[in-house]
UniProtKB/Swiss-Prot annotation:
PANTHER family: 40S RIBOSOMAL PROTEIN S11 FAMILY MEMBER, SMALL RIBOSOMAL SUBUNIT PROTEIN US17M
Keywords linked to the UniProt accession: Ribonucleoprotein, Ribosomal protein, RNA-binding, rRNA-binding
Described function: One of the primary rRNA binding proteins, it binds specifically to the 5'-end of 16S ribosomal RNA.
Protein name: Small ribosomal subunit protein uS17
Organism: Fervidobacterium nodosum (strain ATCC 35602 / DSM 5306 / Rt17-B1)
UniProt-listed InterPro entries: NA-bd_OB-fold (IPR012340), Ribosomal_uS17 (IPR000266), Ribosomal_uS17_bact/chlr (IPR019984), Ribosomal_uS17_CS (IPR019979)
Family that this chain belongs to: Belongs to the universal ribosomal protein uS17 family.
GO biological process, any: translation
Gene (name only): rpsQ
HAMAP family: Ribosomal_uS17_B
Subunit organization: Part of the 30S ribosomal subunit.
Length: 100
């Protein structure tokens, strides 16, 4: 049986070799018939700490790696614009004299 694969957005990368991935799905409401977004968070193994917050990733089901971690990051589909931090140059003007 093939392993399940899901696509989601990284919402946390604070842990070592682990990311939290938010996966959204549409579910039809039983009574009203309207499609409603449902989200679920998965802990996924990121061996090289390559993922950053906001990245769109593909995760795959795996054997249990820890108490909560059962998924592995397979692919980074889209990099976040937030993860690309441009260098900011600051210039400070210091005037030697004082005004009277």
């Amino acid at each position: 049986m093939p392993k399940k694969r899901l696509v989601g957005v990284v919402v946390s990368d604070k842990m070592d070799k682990t990311v939290t991935v938010k996966v959204e799905r549409l579910v039809k409401h039983a009574k009203f018939g309207k499609y409603v977004k449902r989200t679920k968070k998965f802990y996924a193994h990121d061996e090289n700490n390559a993922c950053r917050v906001g990245d769109v990733v593909e995760i795959e089901e795996s054997r249990p790696l820890s108490k909560l971690k059962r998924w592995v990051v397979v692919n980074i589909l889209e990099r976040s614009k937030l993860s690309e931090t441009p260098e900011i140059e600051e210039t400070i003007d210091i005037e030697g004299g004082s005004e009277q």
